[in-house]
């Protein structure tokens, strides 16, 4: 006999409230056939590769820190296209539309030859090589050595209209009921911060705050011992609902373990042995050595490698070549909101450090009788050279209610910059206006300063590049512009071999010549 029974499985119902859907910029932004080329000047920077150099007082910065292992974050400021005096006013209707920029092409050019730079520490915390050790070393009070190595090789750039989001591990606050004990390993947590210009990249020791988590100041090299190494949080940026921080990126990393060492110092986490409980873990991890052997006192188990970036070659370069943006990974398909663009770059394949030696005595070098190393001062300098070229496309944003609602939810300050003509309700029908505000009889004028629009990234360090007067419509006059015209098929070849833009839409014919008999 067939009997109906209710299903015992769980029933999943849709949410009672609708989920807000974020539209892609391709759904409401109209692209035009107007393209601009923009490029920066030759951007140069010089400094010390390991640390900042201050004067004797320690207050005035004389030589900044410039390392090949640092992030370079360029903040490119573009002109407002809504203030352009366009020759063809039929491009857009200012009463119903606004203009924005879209990135279509990018080329990050780097100067200087390829080279490997070394880093290290004169008091590096290592006992001995643990890969090919020939005697048992248990360590002493101070086992630090002067050690250097080459960092992990990394080439990377991230392009977006907001700063790149980085991640690093930081010291966390303990629980409220946990007793504070000296020498106990603190809890750590993952932190998300913007990557700023000058932040150190991971060179093989991880992405963490070495200033707070390594108090002996000798576990890593000099360039990161007092710094925080950050790594781009690709997972967070790829899952961003708007996709402004990362339109696209290119990355190439490589390393291998070159040397294997062990740390000096007292072990914080002992290897489980007979001292635990009633001895039920005895001889599970090791058997103690005899008293007449060097192995009677167990050594440290804090093993670590020093990595190497290996071969640097021009065959695997991400720079000095164009990249074309057809489809971004997020909802923002290359639209540069707020007329700005952030380019985050790391490249330590041009990591050569210059060694400069200067004779300290007041004497001509030709008159030096014999060599004395103490009379020569050695200096280190690192130089970097950049140039960035862009292909920008002019786009139109319709001033519709649903479009403005999404832009307002994304970034309400964009609507303020567009000056849409919204008249707010006056808070006070009458205001005070002084005639002689500069006289001694009235109050100080500083109490009534003009309100300036706050910078959303105030307090962050970027390499700001003003490109408001660097745009050109003559794409064929620039290297990246010619590549774009050829790549997009916007050029056609004439009879004599020259090229013209296909936007003219005119037929090109050769001159008819009379045949020779």
From Swiss-Prot:
The keyword Disulfide bond applies. Keywords: Capsid protein, Disulfide bond, Host nucleus, Host-virus interaction, Late protein, T=7 icosahedral capsid protein, Viral attachment to host cell, Viral penetration into host cytoplasm, Virion, Virus endocytosis by host, Virus entry into host cell. SUPFAM superfamilies: Group I dsDNA viruses. GO terms for biological process: endocytosis involved in viral entry into host cell; virion attachment to host cell. It is found in: Virion; Host nucleus. GO terms for molecular function: structural molecule activity. InterPro entries: Capsid_L1_Papillomavir, Capsid_L1_sf_Papillomavir, dsDNA_vir_gr_I_capsid. Residues 497-517 are annotated as: Disordered. Residues 497-509 have a biased composition (Polar residues). GO terms for cellular component: host cell nucleus; T=7 icosahedral viral capsid. It comes from the Viruses. Gene3D superfamilies: Major capsid L1 (late) superfamily, Papillomavirus (2.60.175.20). Forms an icosahedral capsid with a T=7 symmetry and a 50 nm diameter. The capsid is composed of 72 pentamers linked to each other by disulfide bonds and associated with L2 proteins. Binds to heparan sulfate proteoglycans on cell surface of basal layer keratinocytes to provide initial virion attachment. This binding mediates a conformational change in the virus capsid that facilitates efficient infection. The virion enters the host cell via endocytosis. During virus trafficking, L1 protein dissociates from the viral DNA and the genomic DNA is released to the host nucleus. Belongs to the papillomaviridae L1 protein family. Self-assembles into homopentamers. The capsid has an icosahedral symmetry and consists of 72 capsomers, with each capsomer being a pentamer of L1. Interacts with the minor capsid protein L2; this interaction is necessary for viral genome encapsidation. Interacts with protein E2; this interaction enhances E2-dependent replication and transcription activation. This is Major capsid protein L1.
């Amino acid at each position: 006999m067939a009997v109906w029974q209710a299903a015992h499985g769980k029933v999943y119902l849709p949410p009672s409230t609708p989920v807000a859907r974020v539209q892609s910029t391709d759904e409401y932004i109209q692209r035009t056939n107007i393209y601009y080329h923009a490029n920066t000047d030759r951007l140069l920077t010089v400094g010390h590769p390991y640390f900042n150099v201050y004067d004797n007082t320690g207050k005035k910065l004389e030589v900044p820190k410039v390392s090949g292992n640092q992030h370079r974050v360029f903040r490119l400021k573009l002109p407002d296209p809504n203030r352009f005096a366009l020759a063809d006013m039929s491009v857009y209707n200012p009463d119903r539309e606004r203009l924005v920029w879209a990135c279509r092409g990018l080329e990050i050019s780097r100067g200087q030859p390829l080279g490997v730079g070394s880093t290290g520490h004169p008091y590096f915390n290592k006992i001995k090589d643990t890969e090919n050790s020939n005697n048992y070393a248990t360590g002493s009070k101070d086992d630090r050595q002067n050690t250097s190595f080459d960092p992990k090789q990394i080439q990377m750039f991230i392009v977006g209209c907001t700063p790149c989001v980085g991640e690093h591990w930081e010291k966390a606050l303990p629980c409220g009921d946990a007793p504070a004990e000296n020498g106990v390993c603190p809890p750590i947590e993952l932190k998300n911060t913007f990557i700023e210009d000058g932040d150190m990249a991971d060179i093989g020791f991880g992405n963490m705050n070495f200033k707070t988590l390594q108090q002996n100041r000798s576990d890593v090299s000099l360039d990161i011992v007092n710094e925080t190494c950050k790594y781009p949080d690709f997972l967070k940026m790829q899952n961003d609902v708007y996709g402004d921080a990362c339109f696209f990126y290119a990355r190439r990393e490589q390393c291998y373990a070159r040397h294997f060492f062990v740390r000096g110092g007292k072990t914080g986490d002992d290897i489980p042995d007979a001292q635990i409980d009633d001895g039920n873990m005895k001889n599970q991890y090791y058997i103690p050595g005899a008293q007449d052997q060097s192995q009677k006192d167990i050594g440290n188990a804090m093993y670590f490698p020093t990595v190497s970036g290996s071969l640097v070659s021009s065959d695997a370069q991400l720079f000095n070549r164009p990249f074309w943006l057809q489809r971004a990974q997020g909802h923002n398909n290359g639209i540069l909101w707020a007329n700005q663009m952030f380019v985050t770059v790391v490249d330590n394949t041009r990591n050569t450090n210059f060694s400069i030696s200067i004779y300290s005595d007041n004497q001509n070098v030709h008159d030096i009788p014999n060599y004395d190393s103490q009379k020569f001062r050695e200096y280190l300098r690192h130089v970097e050279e950049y140039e960035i070229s862009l292909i920008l496309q002019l786009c139109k944003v319709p001033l519709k209610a649903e479009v403005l609602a999404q832009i307002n939810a994304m970034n309400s300050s964009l609507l303020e910059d567009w000056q849409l003509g919204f008249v707010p309700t006056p808070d006070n029908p009458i205001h005070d206006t002084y005639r002689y505000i500069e006289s001694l009889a009235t109050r100080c004028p500083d109490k009534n300063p003009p309100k300036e629009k706050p910078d959303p990234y105030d307090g962050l360090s970027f390499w700001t590049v003003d490109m408001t007067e660097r745009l050109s419509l003559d794409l064929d006059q620039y290297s990246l512009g010619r590549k774009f015209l050829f790549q997009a098929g916007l050029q056609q070849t004439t009879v004599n071999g020259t090229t013209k833009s296909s936007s003219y839409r005119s037929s090109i014919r050769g001159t008819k010549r009379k045949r020779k008999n």
